[in-house]
Amino acid sequence: MIRTDAKDGALVLFSGGQDSATCVAWALERYQTVETLGFDYGQRHRVELECREGVRDALKHRFPAWAGRLGDDHMIDLSVLGAISDTAMTRTIEIETAANGLPNTFVPGRNLLFMTIAAAIAYRRGLRVLVGGMCETDFSGYPDCRDDTMKALQVALNLGMDTRVVLETPLMWLDKAQTWQLAEQLGGAALVELIRVETHTCYVGERAELHDWGFGCGECPACKLRKRGYEAYLKGERVTEAPL
């Protein structure tokens, strides 16, 4: 396994959602330079992209120790992905399970493209670590969120670019309650509140009502998962701490 240290710079895939915002904080706690990367692929919940700047600004102003580490932000137009996708993430259709057993919110190739583009940007920027919020503990079954997929992709990227990049997925084995707990461990109640209020998870892009767990419709799979995780976190239902 390729080893990294705090002197290495990191590029975090940052959508504006809970998981990726937690990953930004995780990286800021570890690396001297942290840049962020977002993608506009015509997602139905495009409001998440509008949250990105607010989250970055809040991290700088509320956490002085991290302010000097948070570097440039990059936004990539990946509308071609939306153009070739017929999913509930890119079309206004009912969210349901497809014939292949996967939810129709699955966008084929999304994380593969995201990480490949991220690796190319990291190569140019001299950053050795890529950080993503992929998770297969209480996820929706997306095959491109699996640990095996990320490990295989790391090998392919290093071979294809003759480089030594590391793909870090700090949430891979955490459930949503532990993800909230990790935020608390990283930045206390202030970071939990920042993530609760400033990030966006809802698949349908609803941001009119602030619930205890954050903004959202409360009915889509993403909202239900976030709500359930937040409630479990408040009850302290996880016995062990989230690993840092």
UniProtKB/Swiss-Prot annotation:
The keyword tRNA processing belongs to this UniProt entry's keyword annotation: no
Top-level lineage group: Bacteria
Keywords: ATP-binding, Ligase, Metal-binding, Nucleotide-binding, Queuosine biosynthesis, Zinc
InterPro entries for this protein: QueC, Rossmann-like_a/b/a_fold
UniProt cofactor(s): Zn(2+)
HAMAP family, per database record: QueC
Role according to the record: Catalyzes the ATP-dependent conversion of 7-carboxy-7-deazaguanine (CDG) to 7-cyano-7-deazaguanine (preQ(0)).
Family: Belongs to the QueC family.
Protein name: 7-cyano-7-deazaguanine synthase
Organism: Burkholderia vietnamiensis (strain G4 / LMG 22486)
